[in-house]
Amino acid sequence: MSTAPVTLALMKEILGRVAVGASLSETQAEEVFEIIMSGDATPAQIGGLLLGLRVRGETVEEITGAARIMRAKALKIEAPPGSVDIVGTGGDEAGTFNISTAASFVVAACGVPVAKHGNRAVSSKSGASDVLTALGVNIDADFALVHETLWENKVGFLMAPRHHNAMRHVAGPRGELGTRTIFNLLGPLSNPAGTTRQVVGVFAERWVEPLARVLGRLGAEHAWVVHGTDGLDELTTTGPTRVAEYKGGEVRLFSVTPEEVGLKRAAPADLKGGDSATNAAAMKALLKGEQGAYRDIVVLNAAAALVVAGKVDTLGDGARAAEQAIDRGEAEAVLHRMIAITNRTS
């Protein structure tokens, strides 16, 4: 018997709830996103649902249910125990240097595996994959080589479109809507390595606490969700950063400043990036030990990842470890090994 009538009836029920401003349960969100990510929803149904959720505001339960389906549909890759991810939603429109990508090399050099989930540029001139390509990393390397660099070199780049093939079903409606949707939040929650320790940057402060609660429901061990008061989806050095920490079943809210870990406060202009070639050159200089605003913000974000990894107890200790990894040339060596491994024939 065809499941089409059942699917149509469920979509009508869900769309009817969303149309009147009612929230979906986690189970209902799972059901509707299973239909969507399986290719069984029409473009009109997808667009209507996404816009309805956006206008009303997505709930913790809805985001959790949708993320569960994204994770279930992903092409998985096995990561070492204790791996972390440092990732942002994008969409902050700040056009900064590739902060979390640079921080990934530093964290790996400190002995913590990083399963870096990323994509091409969204609101900047250079996304993670763009700058890695400019650095010489083969982002389309065979999965065997990605696995090798993740396990042997402690950093691997997981190119989102390669792992989330089901996203093709929503590409058309998302593009036509031309506005942020729940999928802007789902990417950082859907690491195909299943990392349970994360630093997640968000484009708006209102998502800091809710996404920490989502990560908890999804099985996180230790996570920071961060938003710079300057608008960055990273920990910022221009002022305070709002943080929601999930650990041990609890969410704790606090702020951090660069000064409290011995870093200089920067001006927003100091953090601006350029195209992928410009950012790659800046990253090479940073990893060779060049001082300045780029280094400081990378150190701060690496420090947060070291905290959630359990490598250090305090952000200050993390900052000192990150600085040492750069100054000893260890972070630069991680990049060079990643370039070599990903360009080999598996």
Swiss-Prot record:
Cofactor(s) essential for the protein: Mg(2+)
Residues binding Mg(2+) 1: S100, E234
Residues reported in the UniProt entry to bind anthranilate 2: R174
Keyword Metal-binding among UniProt keywords: yes
Keyword annotations of the record: Amino-acid biosynthesis, Aromatic amino acid biosynthesis, Glycosyltransferase, Magnesium, Metal-binding, Transferase, Tryptophan biosynthesis
Binding site for Mg(2+) 2: D233, E234
Reported function: Catalyzes the transfer of the phosphoribosyl group of 5-phosphorylribose-1-pyrophosphate (PRPP) to anthranilate to yield N-(5'-phosphoribosyl)-anthranilate (PRA).
Name of protein: Anthranilate phosphoribosyltransferase
Organism: Paramagnetospirillum magneticum (strain ATCC 700264 / AMB-1)
